[in-house]
Amino acid sequence: MSVDAATVRRIAQLARIAVTDAEVPHLQGELNAMLNFVEQLSEVNVEGVEPMTSVTPMAMKKRQDVVNDGEIADDIVKNAPATENHFFLVPKVVE
């Protein structure tokens, strides 16, 4: 894949970046270099390599999957100026 001057101008317009005609060839070369690097990645043999979700080994902390009310309703509403049955009461703003 190759980026032409019109594509550089279009990308600049979409990104709302002012690009002069003198800058277009330089940016075209940089974008093409980036695309060439990405295309090289498709040549890497990854057969037998397990997909990674993180570069560092991590184990997810697990807990029992049980339904509860969170057991903190009183703590949540204790600093609210007005509550009723564990709900926040707010002033009416729409008539």
Curated annotation (Swiss-Prot):
SUPFAM superfamilies: Glu-tRNAGln amidotransferase C subunit. Transmembrane segments: none annotated. It is an enzyme of class 6 (ligase). NCBIfam families: gatC. It catalyses: L-glutamyl-tRNA(Gln) + L-glutamine + ATP + H2O = L-glutaminyl-tRNA(Gln) + L-glutamate + ADP + phosphate + H(+); L-aspartyl-tRNA(Asn) + L-glutamine + ATP + H2O = L-asparaginyl-tRNA(Asn) + L-glutamate + ADP + phosphate + 2 H(+). This is Aspartyl/glutamyl-tRNA(Asn/Gln) amidotransferase subunit C. One of its GO terms (biological process) is translation. Allows the formation of correctly charged Asn-tRNA(Asn) or Gln-tRNA(Gln) through the transamidation of misacylated Asp-tRNA(Asn) or Glu-tRNA(Gln) in organisms which lack either or both of asparaginyl-tRNA or glutaminyl-tRNA synthetases. The reaction takes place in the presence of glutamine and ATP through an activated phospho-Asp-tRNA(Asn) or phospho-Glu-tRNA(Gln). Keywords: ATP-binding, Ligase, Nucleotide-binding, Protein biosynthesis. The gene is gatC.
